[in-house]
From Swiss-Prot:
Belongs to the SVF1 family. It comes from Schizosaccharomyces pombe (strain 972 / ATCC 24843) (Fission yeast). One of its GO terms (molecular function) is ceramide binding. Keywords: Cytoplasm, Endoplasmic reticulum, Golgi apparatus, Lipid transport, Membrane, Nucleus, Transport. Residues 1-18 are annotated as: Peripherally associates with membranes. SUPFAM superfamilies: AttH-like. InterPro entries: AttH-like_dom_sf (IPR023374), Ceramide-binding_SVF1 (IPR051385), Svf1-like_C (IPR033394), Svf1-like_N (IPR013931). This is Ceramide-binding protein svf1.
Length: 380
């Protein structure tokens, strides 16, 4: 029991970090100030990294089906934290936006997993996520009979990263970083196929977005909070990802994003802002969750980097889709102990809302309606 407890605490808290200051993080945004941050992916960017050290690596496929009133995502999680064994997990979520009682959530650990095709594809017992020609993913999974997945995700707009390698690095010596953070995006995808949800076939054919993310280090050492936004319109897609470091790295904010139109990238953006305009206290968690939120994407065109691009959204949030207790899988007595030791109290809030946006491209101004899927994550 003592050994298990010690390893559990190590897993969730790690060792306390000294205050290194903001000089100990090298944000990817700093590397592209004054230059075009847009970079197409190279061959290595399509591969799973699978570092041997503590990490969490994920692939998430977001889908807004044409039929019905749903919002979906399929996620793969590969992790190795502290002294725990490397694990792989699949999650599937179908939000029924009109009838929340029909929402589906499955989370399943996977066995006999490996990385194939030069680490561009993931294979496990009754599950495969295969990259084909760097243009599409073929996803088949029957590891959980409540969510049988058979979809193909096609790339519609060029995938991209911020900067030459996409990495924000951590360490007092930039030439020898001890941790890193990276995101690559397929901002506009076209999904074909279905998910059998508790015996009911859900046609999930429709537009989507894909992100591949790596937290190469203990997650709560790298970030104390997260924000994510996915704005979807019939012609445009905008994405934004922001994290804030713990005080050990100066509470530094790193925000990256991009705007795509049909089959091209309009802009990769790093001078973005997020504001929780209005909040309410969640008495169950003691976090102030947003009820109205503002997003500002600010950059220049991806092709010539001469034309100003700006997109703004300021809207009340619609239905809270889900509140995820990240530590839900551990015993309640240990959860309280972990929180007391480390101050870690991670919860993810997810929302879906109809919104209005304003997009300025040089002298052209476009105002229209779209849908917003967003997440706010509090860690510590």
């Amino acid at each position: 029991m003592k050994a298990w407890l010690q390893s559990s605490i190590s897993y969730y808290t790690g060792t306390a970090e000294p205050v290194y200051g903001p000089e100990a993080i090298q944000p990817v945004t700093a590397s592209v100030q004054g230059i075009n941050p847009f970079h197409r992916l190279e061959a290595d960017d399509f591969k799973w990294s699978t570092p041997s050290s503590s990490h969490v690596e994920t692939q998430v496929f977001y889908i807004k089906p044409n039929e019905g009133d749903y919002m979906c995502f399929v996620q793969l999680i590969h992790s190795n934290l502290g002294s725990w064994t490397t694990t792989a997990q699949s999650t599937c979520r179908i939000f029924d936006l009109k009838h929340p009682e029909n929402d589906l959530w499955t989370s399943t650990n996977m066995d006999q997993f490996s990385f194939e095709n030069d680490k561009t594809s993931f294979v496990a017992k009754n599950c495969s996520v295969v990259l084909e020609d760097q243009k599409r993913y073929r996803i088949r999974a029957s590891i959980n009979m409540d969510s049988i997945i058979d979809i193909t995700v096609h790339q519609d707009a060029p995938p991209f990263k911020i900067g030459e390698d996409g990495n924000s690095t951590y360490g007092t010596d930039p030439s020898k970083p001890w941790a890193s953070m990276k995101h690559t995006f397929w901002p506009r995808t076209r999904v074909e196929g279905s998910i059998v949800a508790r015996g009911r076939v859900v046609d999930v054919t429709g537009p989507g977005m894909f992100v591949h993310a790596l937290q190469n280090g203990k997650p709560h050492h790298l970030a104390s909070s997260w924000e994510f936004a996915l704005l979807q319109h019939k012609k445009f897609t905008a994405i934004m990802m922001q994290f804030k470091t713990p005080p050990s790295y100066g509470s530094t904010i790193v925000n990256i994003g991009g705007i795509a139109m049909k089959d091209k990238i309009i802009s990769a953006t790093v001078d973005n802002t997020i504001e929780h305009v209005e909040t309410t206290l969640d008495p169950d968690t003691e976090w102030h969750e947003p009820t109205r939120i503002s997003y500002e994407w600010d950059g220049k065109d991806a092709e010539t980097y001469t034309e100003d691009i700006h997109l703004s959204v300021d809207a009340p949030l619609g239905r809270r889709l889900q509140r995820i207790d990240v530590l839900a899988e551990i015993p309640s007595w240990l959860k309280g102990f972990v929180h007391g030791v480390s101050g870690t109290k991670p919860f993810i809030y997810q929302y879906f809302s109809p919104v209005k946006f304003t997009l300025k491209m040089g002298d052209e101004v476009i105002e229209d309606e779209a849908t917003l899927f967003n997440e706010t994550t509090f860690i510590s």
